[in-house]
């Protein structure tokens, strides 16, 4: 029963792996719930600051802001790409990278260059290996990143926009739809796209300190930072939900493999017993 011993060893190994994937599934489920809570808590902030900016921009249309004015000609754009630091989360990163590369190819076909800022080890290694122009890298943020951790990286790209080195800046991440569905998303940050606020015909106004222009300038930067942070925590929620599903699938597959191997083992054992009985019967008949 040398083959039977090998099968038993294989079953034992698969069961040990199954314990690991099952534990990882439970950990991912717990982290996903926390990430969802952070994601839902931050959404109202982005919505409110967007409304305030829309109000200010409409009420004070005499002010000129580069973040709100489109360039006549695109020569170079910037993309902040958000990915996970770790793997074992299904095709989450692969689907996002494929979506980004499709856009990059379209831009390059129009002779538009692309500068990239990567957040997460997976995006960093992938796009560096492709030879694209990576301007800034940020990794090891963990499962509970702080808002301030992103400010330096975002500033690198905004400084490029202010210097007219890039004429458009976007953020790419996985948008959390539900536990099953995560959508690769590329959202334009600047120049800002006009929203519904511009359709309102009547505005009351705020009292500003020190003045409306300075307040709006500060809010525009903070809004961009908030959108990138929102993208980051949504991507973390997507990562944990994808990992939970991937680990559940791995655990289920391990169970199926164990069942199949047990069936093979039992058949081999039955054949060995049958052979032994046949040999005993043959020996007895010979006597």
From Swiss-Prot:
GO terms for biological process: proton motive force-driven plasma membrane ATP synthesis. One of its GO terms (cellular component) is plasma membrane. Pfam families: ATP-synt. This is ATP synthase gamma chain. Keywords: ATP synthesis, Cell inner membrane, Cell membrane, CF(1), Hydrogen ion transport, Ion transport, Membrane, Transport. Belongs to the ATPase gamma chain family. The gene is atpG. One of its GO terms (molecular function) is ATP binding. It is found in: Cell inner membrane. Transmembrane segments: none annotated. F-type ATPases have 2 components, CF(1) - the catalytic core - and CF(0) - the membrane proton channel. CF(1) has five subunits: alpha(3), beta(3), gamma(1), delta(1), epsilon(1). CF(0) has three main subunits: a, b and c. Produces ATP from ADP in the presence of a proton gradient across the membrane. The gamma chain is believed to be important in regulating ATPase activity and the flow of protons through the CF(0) complex. The lineage of its organism: Bacteria, Pseudomonadati, Pseudomonadota, Gammaproteobacteria, Candidatus Pseudothioglobaceae. It comes from the Bacteria. It is a peripheral membrane protein. InterPro entries: ATP_synth_F1_ATPase_gsu (IPR035968), ATP_synth_F1_gsu (IPR000131), ATP_synth_F1_gsu_CS (IPR023632).
């Amino acid at each position: 029963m040398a083959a039977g011993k090998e099968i038993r060893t294989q079953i034992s190994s698969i069961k040990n792996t199954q314990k690991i994937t099952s534990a990882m599934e439970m950990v991912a489920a717990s982290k996903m719930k926390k990430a969802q809570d952070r994601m839902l808590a931050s959404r109202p902030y982005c919505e409110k600051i967007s409304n305030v900016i829309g109000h200010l921009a409409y009420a004070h249309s005499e002010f000129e802001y580069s973040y709100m004015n489109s360039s006549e000609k695109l020569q170079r754009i910037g993309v902040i790409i958000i990915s996970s630091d770790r793997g074992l989360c299904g095709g989450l990163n692969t689907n996002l990278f494929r979506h980004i590369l499709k856009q990059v190819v379209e831009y390059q076909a129009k002779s538009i260059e692309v500068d990239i800022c990567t957040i997460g080890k997976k995006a960093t290694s992938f796009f560096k290996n492709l030879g694209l122009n990576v301007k800034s890298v940020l990794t090891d943020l963990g499962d509970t990143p702080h808002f301030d951790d992103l400010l330096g990286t975002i500033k690198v790209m905004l400084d490029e926009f202010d210097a007219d080195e890039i004429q458009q800046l976007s953020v790419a991440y996985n948008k959390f739809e539900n536990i099953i569905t995560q959508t690769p998303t590329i959202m334009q940050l600047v120049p800002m796209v006009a929203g519904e606020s511009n359709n309102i015909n009547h505005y009351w106004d705020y009292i500003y300190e020190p003045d409306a222009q300075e307040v709006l300038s500060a809010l525009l930067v903070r809004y961009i930072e908030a959108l990138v942070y929102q993208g980051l925590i949504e991507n973390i929620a997507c990562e944990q939900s994808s990992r939970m599903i991937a680990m559940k699938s791995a655990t289920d597959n391990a169970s199926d493999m164990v069942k199949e191997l047990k069936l093979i083992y039992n058949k081999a054992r039955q054949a060995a017993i049958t052979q032994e009985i046949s040999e005993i019967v043959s020996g007895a008949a010979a006597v």
